[in-house]
Design a protein with these regions (language model features):
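Skp1-binding F-box subdomain of Cullin-RING ligase substrate receptors
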Residues: 2-5, 9-12, 20-164, 169
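Substrate-receptor adaptors of ubiquitin E3 ligases
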Residues: 90, 94-412
Length: 412
């Protein structure tokens, strides 16, 4: 999936010139030394050929990804220059600082380059295949699925190795990167018959040092990073300022790359989908990110939720010599089905592979709608199961009473 950098049509030279003038004006506004040349920004441009391609390149290298893609569609000159890998490498480096690492750059080059990597990972996963009808006919594992059906195609599974996957993770707080990590493979997954394949799938990113990781120290946030000062946890319980700042300011990107099939996708929701404050202790704050992934032909539920958990702990409150400081204590990934059960390692590998080729969108509201739809249907399913269990309980109680009455009736 590539960003379309082909012009929609032969845009008129007048429109091209307007775009160029605007970009040149913005370019010159960055430099205080070139203020004398500001008049260039309003000078008429007679033709595209009258401007240097070096100037175009200098303009485009200052743009972010969406703007660069839009500019590439405006004229043939921009379209040609926008194919330069160095431009997209700069965009990816700004968006995901972890891509600055030499080993990650080599990885991205091996799977198609930075332009393809950005096109795959900037849009977020959207899955709207969750319907009420589907969950009203939710099949039970033992009755509806045979063992062969449940475990699917063994040949396909044997072609998937945990070592094929790479996690590229970046955390931002108020546009400042506070953590960048790269995890090669999936820890503790060696051996086909090992416990990994049958036990609940979970990656604890902070537990394992990434290969040649340059950011292996503690990840902290303090007042100097923009956190509000907290005098005491009792006060925070009442006003919740710190909790609100964390929800509004934290952003997570968790990109999964499969080196064998040369595909990548961002499994995070960028902004938090929810969380819990003061849990499990009053000093802990847990934020939940994630996405809804397809599991068709893998699990009976057809879709699962990828849950990315981030936990911060208050290690200092405001005092005379210390600032309010939080420490990142957990960053993990796990998959859960509609009933809240953890997906095992074997099926998780199949789901992750399928997720790398599913539908994505740059429309963030559509991404949120997909996640909220999943939560809504999941809640309805749980309520329906509770109603069924409640009816069964009443039937069992009435049956027990009836047997008890009949027993004494026969005796007497």
């Amino acid at each position: 999936m590539l960003i379309d950098v082909t012009p929609y049509s032969q845009v008129s030279l007048k429109h091209d010139s307007s775009i160029i003038l605007l970009l040149v004006y913005n370019l010159l506004s960055f430099s205080s030394d070139d203020q004398r040349s500001m008049a260039m920004a309003v000078a008429p441009v007679e033709s595209m050929e009258s401007l240097s391609s070096d100037l175009f390149y200098d303009i485009l290298r200052r743009l972010d990804g969406p703007t660069l893609a839009s500019a590439a569609c405006s004229c043939a000159a921009f379209c040609s220059i926008s194919k330069e890998e160095k431009l997209w490498e700069n965009v990816c480096s700004s968006m995901w600082p972890s891509t600055n690492r030499e080993d990650v750059r080599s990885l991205i080059s091996s799977i198609g380059g930075f332009r393809k990597f950005y096109a795959d990972c900037f849009p977020l996963i959207v899955n709207k295949e969750v319907t009420e009808h589907q969950w009203n006919n939710y099949p039970e594992y033992p009755e509806e699925w045979t063992e062969a059906e449940y475990y699917g195609d063994m040949d396909e599974f044997e072609s998937i190795l945990p070592s094929d996957f790479v996690s590229i993770v970046d955390i931002r707080y108020k546009d400042k990167t506070i953590c960048s990590k790269v995890l090669w493979g999936i820890p503790n997954a060696n051996g086909f018959d090992g416990w990994f394949y049958n036990c609940p799938f979970r990656i604890d990113l902070l537990t394992y040092a990434a290969r040649d990781d340059e950011n292996d120290g503690e990840v902290t946030l303090s007042v100097s990073d923009g956190l509000p000062p907290i005098a005491s946890m009792e006060r925070e319980r009442k006003d919740g300022k710190l909790w609100q700042e964390l929800r509004d300011g934290l952003r997570l990107s968790w990109i999964v790359v499969n080196r064998k099939i040369k595909q990548a996708a961002n499994l995070a929701s960028w902004s938090p989908l929810g969380g819990q404050r003061h849990w499990p202790t009053e000093k802990d704050f847990v934020l939940r990110f994630g996405s809804v992934l397809p599991a068709k032909d893998i699990l009976p539920c057809q879709v699962v939720e990828c849950i990315l958990s981030m936990k911060f702990r208050v290690i200092h409150t405001e005092g005379e010599d210390v600032q309010t400081t939080l420490k990142l204590t957990e960053l993990s990934m796990q998959l859960e089905d509609m009933e809240g059960s953890h997906v095992n390692g074997r099926n998780s590998l199949l789901i992750l592979k399928k997720a790398l080729s599913c539908r994505r969108s740059k429309n963030y509201s559509e991404v949120l709608e997909s996640c909220h739809l999943y939560s809504k249907v999941q809640s309805e399913l749980k309520e329906e199961k509770m109603r069924i269990e409640s009816r069964l309980d009443r039937i069992f109680i009435l049956g027990g009473i009836s047997v008890f009455v009949m027993f004494w009736y026969i005796i007497l």
